[in-house]
Amino acid sequence: MKDKIIDNAITLFSEKGYDGTTLDDISKSVNIKKASLYYHYDNKEEIYRKSVENCFNYFIDFLLRNHDDNYSIDGLYQFLFKFIFDVDERYIKLYVQLSSAPEALNSEIKHHLQEINTTLHDELIKYYDPTHIALDKEDFINLILLFLETWYFRASFSQKFGIIEDSKNRFKDQVYSLLNVFLKK
């Protein structure tokens, strides 16, 4: 039941944010009484905390499961495409919602962000090849991270308004433009 509560809470928090999600919403989503939630969790903050933790664990697991050993420009393109469009949309939306998380969770969220950024940095650096890329390592990483953050923000809206297929087509054009910026001619 604890896992089901968190799974449903992730959906609710991703759609309504922390403030918009109530314990009533969560209890109804798992067909239990609100009082029964307290058997499993102390309060809404604890449920949110666990939801955020699961979100970051999902991203790290996704990164580690979905890379391949093709550390080329084509491999980078495939990696970016997977990391944007194959991630469960609930986690993208929850990630975007973190900017309005309770202040009491700021240090935990910062820790999770640092952990995911380290994992992502370590994965992206494998694609860096100075014989093909005109930027230094840090500029390369920063440009890719900026691109991903922008796409996650955009994808959260695309999912909401049902235009994800159009976004995939634009992504192809934009990632080629991005790659052309830092590829040596």
Swiss-Prot record:
Gene3D superfamilies: Tetracycline Repressor, domain 2. Residues 1-59 form the HTH tetR-type domain. Disulfide bonds: none annotated. It comes from the Bacteria. Disruption phenotype: Cells lacking this gene display a 5.8-fold increase in ica operon expression. The keyword rRNA-binding does not apply. Residues 22-41 bind DNA. Represses transcription of the icaADBC operon necessary for biofilm production. This is Biofilm operon icaADBC HTH-type negative transcriptional regulator IcaR.
